[in-house]
Amino acid sequence: MKKILFCLFYYQFLISLLKPLYRLQVWRRSHKRDNYQQEVAQRFGKQYPSPPIAMDEDHKGVIWCHAVSLGETNTVAPLLDMLMANGYQIWLTNTTQTGFARGASRFVDEIAQGRMSHSYVPVDSPAVIETFLAHVQPIAALFVETELWANILTKLAQHQIPSVLVNGRLSSSSFKSYQKIAAVSTSMMKNLALIIAQDSDSAKRFRQLGADSAQIRVAGSLKWVINTPKANSNTINIDDQDADTAE
């Protein structure tokens, strides 16, 4: 436990040192684009859009969903449709500009109606994450496929906000990279309430990184539903994950 805490402290220290370099990277990549100031402000917790609006008295709260890029956004879109149809509001974040553009176009109506808010993901800095969570006030967080951040998951756990990895995929090369920061990886696994893996190989690798078997479900890939019509069934309930993880 002490080793994990020390590694997390060291990780946080490195992140604080790297923030100026990351800001420079964002500037180099984006400064010629019209939304450069918006991207920087959102990544560093300076300015966010308004939270989603509850459309009726039966609203269930805001779910934060993070999808890295275009592919992950396409994959998770039908699930977000179902959650909104069941009374949840969504805050969608992306890492890449292509992912952000896809999110904005795929959910243009939902964003205009106020049922969804959309921004770039905050940098993995404790202070920035605190600002983001205070603004969004999510009841749960969904992360799509692979991209996980230690400080984000730690802060969510501290605020007792369950984190769920959906469509979880961990290739052999990614697994080796996570093994290089084993203590930090173990911390991230322990801070996830539920891991919904694409396949048994990924599930095994998540366990080897420190996830408990009770945390993991193997459910196949979400990608088969990319082209299905928008759903409005009553089969999705985020509260079910608490019961699942207690089995």
Where on the chain are the PLM-derived regions?
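Compositionally biased, charge-rich terminal segments
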Residues: M1-I15
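Active-site and donor-binding regions of nucleotide-sugar-utilizing enzymes
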Residues: R23, W27-P49, I53-T228
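Acidic, glycine-rich loop-and-beta core segments that form the ion-binding/anion-interacting portion
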Residues: V218, K223-E247
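Hydrophobic alpha-helical transmembrane segments of integral membrane proteins
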Residues: S16-L17, A140
